[in-house]
């Protein structure tokens, strides 16, 4: 279903879809490829704090809707992608930078220093600041997921309105993983509403 549309066209065609064809399935292979492509997203120090739980079991979708304010799309979408943030993402610094050396992206001495700096810096950051970084990075990759999904012919809607504590408890998340948002993905059952934007002149200033 992948298209060859220009990125700009995909951006403008993407809408938040809340009504899905409940009979449409998306293969796990397709979703894995989608998420792998999305991980090209930038992140702070390339620490890649995102984790994903793909929920494609209808019974589980129904269960999580109990603490997601009974949103129709939770149950009718082909899958729900839960975007999770890992507050211990910096513990992967050595693995990440060693891979950069292996791939020829940087010399070993620079990679070693960057890994040590990341471990020291992120290990000392207050939790609130760390959560801000993780939420920012999660927003970047979530946008990539939605655009890539649209390119593949699927629609999405991001949802921040759910009880994150109850979700974490239900999914038995470890203490270092925090739920950030839910992304519904599937085939639209009808056209989405359009949405206006404020004039760009009101949103932009130059130099001050």
List the model feature ranges, each with a label.
Residues 1-208:
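Acidic, surface-exposed loops and disordered segments
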């Amino acid at each position: 279903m992948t298209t060859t549309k220009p990125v700009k066209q995909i951006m403008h065609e993407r809408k938040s879809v809340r009504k899905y064809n409940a009979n449409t399935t998306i293969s796990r292979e397709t979703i894995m490829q989608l998420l792998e492509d999305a991980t090209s997203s930038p992140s702070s120090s390339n620490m890649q704090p995102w984790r994903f739980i793909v929920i494609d079991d209808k019974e589980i979708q129904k269960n999580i809707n109990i603490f997601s304010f009974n949103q129709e799309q939770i149950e009718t979408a082909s899958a729900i992608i839960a975007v999770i943030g890992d507050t211990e993402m910096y513990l992967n610094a050595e693995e990440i930078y060693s891979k950069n050396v292996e791939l020829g992206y940087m010399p070993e001495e620079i990679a070693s220093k960057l890994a040590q700096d990341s471990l020291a810096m992120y290990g000392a950051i207050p939790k609130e600041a760390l959560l801000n970084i993780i939420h920012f990075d999660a927003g970047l990759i979530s946008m990539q997921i939605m655009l890539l999904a649209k390119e593949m012919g699927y629609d999405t809607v991001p949802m921040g309105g759910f009880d994150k504590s109850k979700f974490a408890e239900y999914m038995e998340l470890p203490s270092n993983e925090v739920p950030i948002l839910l992304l519904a993905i599937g085939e639209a059952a009808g056209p989405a509403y359009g949405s206006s934007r404020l004039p760009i002149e009101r949103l932009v200033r130059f130099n001050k």
